[in-house]
Design a protein with these regions (language model features):
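C-terminal amphipathic helix plus adjacent low-complexity
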Residues: 377-378, 382-422
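Membrane-proximal basic amphipathic "stem/tether" segments
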Residues: 1-48
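Nucleotide-activated donor-binding/catalytic signature segment of Leloir-type glycosyltransferases, i.e.
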Residues: 296-319
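Conserved catalytic-core segment of nucleotide-activated headgroup transferases in glycan assembly
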Residues: 65-70, 219, 224-302, 374, ...
Length: 422
């Protein structure tokens, strides 16, 4: 009798689940049905050996490296039609309705990557991505606020599967997670390709806090497409024997409490002036000057003076889209919290982390063990003095971290291609 009762309970639960699912499908037909049709279309194309259409939506030269190996690997595949879709972008530091062209077309021209420009400047109209009949779409950034309606994830996911790869490896915790892990975009995505298990755990924990743990099943650990490229580009041939080069990467805004640009600007200038064999390369984030002008922390005249100051042999302003060139030239990185700390680790060179608040997540804390953390000008100068003299006590620690979290044979793009074509 008990078995019969248990069976009836299970049957009732199953019926309730089916009824609930049918109800959801009825209520959310506009959400579920288009996505089911997309999935079936892709499956049919795979089974009939038709080429899959892949689109990379891109707008910024500085983070193109995330796409470089995807572009190269996918373009070689006989199963893929590859399109690079270049656009201008919106941002909170720009007036509403204004879209900025960041020069990606010129950069792609310089490296012989063909593209389609998705915006008609004369008519102020956008090319509808649907016209390209994409099967898979990769975004350079997962922020719907940067895109017009015809490129937002909610619309695009009705006719294509969205693939997320990080434009930056997130090393920070707290409020910033609200920005860098956009739930609306992740809900519309089919695949979330993540660098490593520790970052998967961080994102999963965030999903749990946001009551969206169902998104975890979308996560696939593939390695980093950026690290895959960095390893092919780093070398020591650019190092000069008699010059010690500091690469400085301060954060682009002060509202987060992490930026040390104004704290160490004069300190680093003075250090270079006091040491004739020391060079400083200042590499501002693409939004740095735009943001400081927007917030009133700098004027146009002050920005011009900074650029003029960094125009000498030993004070260099680096706005080259290819930041790995600066990696190769530098003897040490001095940086606020930034994903480039993670990428610079691949060079095996020392890193000075300019710590201001407790902001690093679990992965950032692991990397910090191999960094020289400084909290004031005196500590920064002492640390630089030691490194100029080649006193690098954390070299072995960095080697251990590299062995644990980095792979010189990183093939993230090949893994992603295999997942999407099988």
């Amino acid at each position: 009798m008990r078995k019969v009762i248990n069976f009836l309970k299970k049957l009732n639960n199953s019926i309730n689940y089916v009824n609930k699912l049918n109800n959801e499908l009825s209520i959310n037909n506009d959400y579920y049905i288009p996505r089911m049709l997309v999935e079936n279309r892709i499956l049919l194309k795979k089974n009939t050996q038709q080429k899959l259409n892949v689109v990379l939506i891109a707008f910024e030269p500085e983070t193109w490296l995330m796409f470089q190996s995807i572009y190269e690997t996918f373009s070689k595949s006989e199963k893929i039609n590859m399109t690079v879709f270049v656009i201008p972008y919106a941002h909170s530091t720009l007036p509403e309705g204004v879209y900025k062209d960041d020069g990606l077309r010129e950069y792609l021209d310089s490296i012989d990557v063909p593209y389609i420009y998705g915006y008609n400047e004369k008519t102020n109209t956008w090319l509808d991505l649907f016209q390209l009949r994409p099967d898979y779409v990769f975004y350079q950034a997962p922020y719907n606020g940067m895109y017009p309606e015809t490129l937002k994830s909610g619309y695009v996911s009705r006719f294509a599967q969205i693939c997320f790869i990080p434009y930056a490896t997130i090393l920070m915790k707290g409020k910033i997670e609200e920005t860098v892990y956009p739930i609306d975009f992740f809900k519309d995505s089919t695949y979330l390709f993540i660098e490593n298990d520790i970052n998967k755990n961080i994102i999963t924990e965030y999903f749990s806090i946001k009551d969206t743990l169902f998104l975890e099943k979308k996560i696939i650990v593939t390695g980093s497409t950026k690290i895959e490229n960095v390893y092919t580009l780093i070398n020591d041939t650019s190092l000069e024997k008699n010059i010690f080069t500091i690469l400085w990467l301060p954060r682009w805004n002060t509202r987060e409490g992490m930026c040390t640009f104004f704290d160490y600007y004069d300190i680093l200038l003075a250090y270079v002036q006091e040491h004739e064999n020391v060079r400083l390369i200042f590499r501002p984030h693409p939004l740095t000057f735009q943001n400081f002008i927007h917030t009133g922390e700098m004027t146009l005249a002050e920005v011009s003076r900074v650029k003029e100051t960094f125009s000498t042999q030993n004070l260099i302003l680096d706005e080259n889209p290819d930041y790995v060139t600066a990696f190769n030239t530098a003897n040490v990185l001095v940086a606020d919290p930034t994903s480039l700390i993670y990428e610079f680790f691949a060079t095996q060179k020392p890193i000075i982390y300019t710590r201001k608040i407790d902001i690093l997540n679990a992965f950032g804390a692991e990397l910090e063990k191999g960094c020289y953390s400084v909290t004031n000008a005196e500590e920064l100068k002492n640390c630089l003095d030691n490194l100029v003299l080649k006193n690098d006590r954390l070299a072995k620690t960095r080697s251990y971290i590299i062995q644990r979290y980095f792979d010189k044979n990183e093939k993230a793009s090949e893994q992603i291609l295999d997942i999407l074509t099988h």
